[in-house]
Amino acid sequence: LFNQSGAKYFWESLKTTGIYTFWEVVITLVGGILLALLFNRMTRGFNAMRSIVFMPKYIAVSTSAVVFMWILYSPAASGANQSEGILNYALSLFGIQGPHWLIDANTALTGILFLTAWRVVGYAMMIYLSAMKGIPQDYYEAASIDGADGVQRFRHITVPLLAPTTLFLFVTTFIASMKVFQSVDVMTGGGPGTATNVMVQWIYNLTFKDFRTARGAAVSAVFFVILLVCTVATMRFSNKNVNYDS
């Protein structure tokens, strides 16, 4: 781990994990609150649409990964034809040449994030929606009387009162995304090259494929410390900046 080669792979994996984590957190929080705002205004078809959006959370990660792997590219094909997945075929009908999603180092992580967005946004929407239902309508009515528009009500009422919910989603999503493994292992195996070689994938490869158990254990210990420090820092920040009073 601490020689030149090991340090290089460590920082590459940590960087890839950080990029993936950043985008998963953004997708979860932004997508979740936008969908919650939409569903909070719905009057017809609410239960059906809510179930459809939330359903991906119940599907196993490995199963979802296999489905998205076929959507993004065809593993049964060879060479350039592997990029002709269902999505690229649909794009070709409109004269658009889609990228080589999972076999191009520049787009492989994006392909995995498609799966992530499909799975997590519905869950975040349900959490945000439950919190929104608990906000007293008196606050909005008083703000309307004072002349506040929709954006101002959202900014000064909804966002502050959803801060504890946002913190919960941030912490749980951060931890889950930092230790992402199944979707990466099924869809790319850490490739092409090391483009999607996140930390847990690298630890798995070291321990169970290269049989370098000692190095895998060392990386695991360092990674655990990183997660612990980040989580403690987040909780300390929240204690000072998040208001838990209703």
What does each model-identified segment do?
Residues L1-S246:
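A structural signal for multi-pass alpha-helical bundles of membrane permease subunits
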